[in-house]
Amino acid sequence: MRLHGAIVLLAALLALVTAQQRGGGRSRGGVKGSAWGGRPAPFRSWDTARYRPWQEGTARQNDCWRGGDVTFDISNDAPTLVGARATFSIALRFPGTQTVLPDGRVVWSQNCTVNGTRMLQGDPVYPEQLAEGSDGVFPDGQPFPRSAWGKRGRFVYVWWTWGRYWQVVDGATSQLTVGTDGVALGSYTMEVVVYHYRGRQRFIPIGHASTQFSITDQVPIAVDVTQLEVAAGDGGSFVRNRPVAFNVRLHDPSHYLRDADISYSWDFGDQSGTLISRSPTVTHTYLQAGSFAARLVLQAAIPLSSCGTSAPPVVDPTTGPVPSLGPTATQPVGPTGSGTATAPSNLTGSGTAAAPGTTAAPRASGAPAEPTGVSVAVLSDSAATEPLPDPVLSTAVADAAAGTDPTADPLPPTSVSSGGDAPGTVAPTAVEGSVAAGVGTAEDVAAATPGATAADVAVDTAGATDGDAVGPTAAATAESIADPTAGATDGDAVGATAESIADPTAGATDGDAVGPTAAATAESIADPTAGATAVSSGSATAGATAEPLLLVKRQAPEAEPTGCVLYRYGTFSTELNIVQGIESVAIVQVVPAAPEGSGNSVELTVTCEGSLPEEVCTVVADAECRTAQMQTCSAVAPAPGCQLVLRQDFNQSGLYCLNVSLANGNGLAVASTHVAVGGASPAASGTTLTVGLLWAPLIAAALGTAAYTYRRVKYSPLLPTAPTAPRPHSWLPPGATLRLLLRQAFGGAPSGESSPLLRANAV
């Protein structure tokens, strides 16, 4: 018995010591900002025999790699939209005398001597020992996947953040992709320690690195603002009367928004209105100079794959709550311990709140490759923040525009059966401490209610004291009055879109809130006390005995539940400096220069509109304007107007293409013309000297055609019948076709009608 008791006591002591050792290696600090202690602090277990913890700055760690130090290039694709996937990349940079082969081995790239040992080019830095079976395990004891057996140049990467860790076996480059579902918004640190396999169950730590990343609920965007055919000026200036291009670039490396419906709302700041487009590229022309603030609001409607397609259940408004047809936005809760906002609970993904789904996509030799192995562990005792509902989903922009409190309970939209053929849905408005005024007058309301007069309506509305709200909104029209909506409290107004107000509002007393809504399926006036929180018995009786109003039932179209769409927004704004540039250039005159020298010189008169130029350049090219032969530039003296007289000398006679460009700090304008030098008569005006020679044949042909046409269609009166005169002898018969053609061609026809039939002459 004593021996048995001693064994039990020793076993209990051993269990206690083991528990203390495990508990001493754990850290229960916050998820963010935890200091690196050589291994993930809340690690479930750590095999120190195989994986020695990394200790920064120790002499043992300084000589962990033969031939020099190994550095790391670590990066991530943040900022990451909450719900998307974040990717982390790391690449090992070995000493300059070493290189990585395509199969993953690290070898010497040249002959060298290290610590007195001669190294030959192509030899491995460390002898390769292929681990199989029990030799290949992760730090927490999980075995390598079979795909990692027999691999060369293996490294083990232990990633850690959010109180969780991921283990990946890979080559000299590796990637880790994790989900962000349920992660609170904010900035985080991803840390990684790298181990190299040396054989015999030995994994040597070679370094530690970290990178900062952020999780946001704003769509990350960048906008490129450019203007074509404008010289680049200082300060990002743009020229008026020329289109400015805006190109939006989404930062979505994980393609989280690939199925989203994205719209862009532009306000260019020049009082030109709002442009809504679904194209990421738009252009806008500023007509005035000055400073303008261009703003963009991007809306992404993301379909949720986990949402069902069934229609919302139909609830009797007199017996049950009114179902909310608005976006499924949950109410905000208190801030988390880290003081950041929380992610929405209705986001979908492969991960969960405790363990976001992860995938490993390692790379080798600079190209993507399949992962050799990955192990994901979740900490049961970590301080990771539990996912909380996002207080702002699709209602964020609406609350900001209306100035309402997003923490208040959202009012359900009102289903309206309008007089037209297409029923709609409108959202009610809430007004505190005031009386909502409808668009209809008292007479309109009375006319729409059988048995009610304008005076009755006035009495009904006058019965509501301070703090009451009676008045439908003017968002749409309806033919029916339904039950008051639930949740109307003292001082609130539940708006109804209706054309008539029935008698249930007559019984409202002090402290009551009456707000009828328009229901599509209601056929009669129901009990007005169903949706009010403080209604007296007298008002209930008055409302119940009111004469019912006959309504027409209409079938509302089945709409997709709005809770199946998640709305995310992105914003951008920038200041644009619009200046007046050189808007146009024209060569109005080209004349020969004064007769001096060789005579191969011309003078050009150039005018421009807009700002004054600071520099003028002329380029002389061949007749096809392809090969430049001469270029000259000169400064332009200040002048009150933009008119220049330029002199251009040519080496020899011929036809040339002359290009004139005017430039200043705000823009550039160009004009071209052809110039014929030597032998050609100069043109007094126009853009070329050869215009007369080129157009002369065409003008002559046009004049001849006009004269012939006039001769053919000219009217001639019929002449009186005259006796037939004797005709001279001719070798052609009078009615021959050739004779008639020659007569018409050479004008030999008489001035009268040429047809002998009309002249009553014998043929």
From Swiss-Prot:
Q: Which Gene3D superfamilies match?
A: Immunoglobulins
- What main location does UniProt list? other
Give the result of residue 558 to K, as annotated.
In strain: Broiler
Tell me the InterPro entries matching this sequence: Ig-like_fold, PKAT, PKAT_KLD, PKD/Chitinase_dom, PKD_dom, PKD_dom_sf
**PTM text:** Glycosylated.
Any keyword Cytoplasm? Answer: no
Region annotated Disordered, chain positions: 313-372, 402-428
Report the GO terms under cellular component.
melanosome; melanosome lumen; plasma membrane
Decide whether keyword Cell membrane is in the record. no
Q: Which residue ranges does the record assign to the PKD domain?
A: 223-323
Tissue specificity comment: Specific to pigmented epithelial cells and melanocytes. Not expressed in lens, neural retina, brain, heart, gizzard or liver.
Segments for region (4 X 24 AA approximate tandem repeats of T-[AD]-[EG]-D-[AV]-[AV]-[AG]-[AP]-T-[AP]-[AG]-A-T-A-[AE]-[DS]-[IV]-A-[DV]-[DP]-T-A-G-A): 441-532
According to the record, where are the sequence repeats? 441-464, 465-488, 489-508, 509-532
Record-linked Pfam families: PKAT_KLD (PF20433), PKD (PF00801)
Positions annotated as glycosylated:
111, 115, 346, 651, 659
UniProt keyword list: Glycoprotein, Repeat, Signal
From which residue to which does the signal peptide run?
Answer: 1-19
Subcellular location(s): the record lists: Melanosome lumen
Q: Where along the chain is composition biased (Low complexity)?
A: 313-323, 348-371
- What's an example Gene Ontology biological process for this entry? melanosome organization
- Polar residues bias located where? 327-347
Query: What, per the annotation, is the impact of changing residue 35 to V?
Result: In strain: Dun
What job does this protein perform?
Answer: Might be required for polymerization of melanin onto the core structure of melanosomes with enzymatic function of tyrosinase.
In the record, the note on similarity to other proteins reads: Belongs to the PMEL/NMB family.
The protein, known as: Melanocyte protein PMEL
Q: Which organism is it from?
A: Gallus gallus
* Designated gene of the protein: PMEL
